[in-house]
Design a protein with these regions (language model features):
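Short, conserved sequence motifs used for protein processing/export or organelle targeting and
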Residues: 19-20, 29-65, 71-214
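Short, conserved secondary-structure transition motifs
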Residues: 25-26
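Secretory targeting signatures
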Residues: 1-7, 209-238
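Typically the conserved alpha-helix immediately C-terminal to a functionally engaged Cys/Sec
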Residues: 1-15, 32-34
Length: 238
């Protein structure tokens, strides 16, 4: 995480970070979302297997949904920083295109409300037919003293995933309880499948026998440029 955050800070670009925690067969991590983990495996699992012998090698990082860093290879934050920086500076597919993405949340009781979203490209209509939209509910910071990061605080935690029907529409939704604090937000993501995606960076060569050292709380990060939309939602405490 340290190397990724240092690279983001140096890039000077506004970014959104989504931290996925393990859920399936996980007994220690309270933050996992099974549907989000299944999506990760379906979207990045094969690419991860091509780089390392695991479908989800924690910690793994995906930049702009296209460049996968599977595991850390035993490297520390400073060593990983230039690797992430290179991926952050790599233009993503369709970076020369433009679109308008919007997301709104309305609620009378701060818990139950209506989500409205849209994605418009104008007359060019360049979006691939495979384009789909989804929303992640993200908690900015959650304290869990029993966690393995030694800090007690976990940031940008994905708490729920909402698969949307179409790239425009509205739906009723009930926010999950925040783990602590009052810091839930909604992040709208648009994704597509490319015929020949450049999805893998790695594997990284390990420097010691620790290889990828899967911790008890395994994090999978997704970093996206601000191509979608993000809003602060009404929240409630646990």
């Amino acid at each position: 995480e340290e190397g990724l955050m240092l690279a983001i800070e140096d890039s000077g670009k506004e970014t959104i970070v989504l931290a996925f925690h393990r859920a399936i067969a996980e007994v220690e991590d309270p933050f996992g979302v099974e549907s989000a983990e299944n999506r990760w495996s379906e979207r990045y699992g094969d690419a991860s297997l091509n780089a390392v012998p695991l479908r989800a090698a924690a910690p793994s990082t995906v930049i702009n949904g296209e460049l996968l860093h599977a595991g850390s290879g035993g490297l520390d934050g400073e060593s990983l920083k230039p690797i992430y920086a290179q991926s952050l500076s790599t233009p993503n597919h369709f970076s020369d295109k433009s679109a308008t993405s919007s997301l709104s949340w309305s609620s009378e009781d701060t818990v139950n409300g209506t989500i409205t979203w849209s994605l418009e490209t104008g007359p060019s209509d360049w979006l691939p037919e495979s384009t789909t939209s989804l929303i992640f509910v993200v908690e900015a910071s959650a304290t869990f003293e029993e966690g393995s990061n030694g800090l007690g605080d976990y940031h940008d935690v994905v708490r729920d995933m909402i698969e949307l029907e179409g790239n425009n529409g509205s739906m009723s939704y009930t926010l999950p309880s925040a783990w602590d604090g009052d810091d839930l937000s909604l992040v709208l993501i648009h994704e597509w499948q490319l015929p020949e995606p450049d999805c893998c960076v790695g594997p990284l060569e390990p420097e010691d026998d620790g290889l990828f050292g899967l911790p008890s709380i395994g994090l999978l990060w997704v970093v996206v440029g601000l191509a979608g939309a993000a809003i602060m939602a009404a929240r409630r405490e646990r």
